[in-house]
């Protein structure tokens, strides 16, 4: 029996590799392995908790320089003294807010996830973008189409 979903996943993984977006490619390959093995029983958990686990891991990665001391507390305190750093803080707040809207949109309208993923892969492939955009892109989409 022909599995169209598997073909789509393989195509997206290939796009990931072609566009040098190894994060997307490896993620899709892991999902393909889960799909074609008995691990597929974990899909309900992955669908329910995957985004939360991913955000936790991302937050750990972002906070690691503070926790390790690589980014000293004095540098953090000085970020409130420079207008460029204050702009960076404001943009960080805005982008975090957008990401929150994006998470809500992706949960409420999962049919948009494929479009966001394809758009991210195309942005990396065609415009030398960086593959960090699906949550922020979803947040921007939510400003246009609403959260429902």
Swiss-Prot record:
Keywords: Cell membrane, Membrane, Transmembrane, Transmembrane helix. Pfam families: DUF441 (PF04284). The keyword Thylakoid does not apply. It is found in: Cell membrane. GO terms for cellular component: plasma membrane. The chain crosses the membrane at residues 14-34, 51-71, 86-106, 121-141. It comes from the Bacteria. The keyword Oxidoreductase does not apply. Belongs to the UPF0756 family. HAMAP family: UPF0756. This is UPF0756 membrane protein YeaL. It comes from Salmonella arizonae (strain ATCC BAA-731 / CDC346-86 / RSK2980). The gene is yeaL.
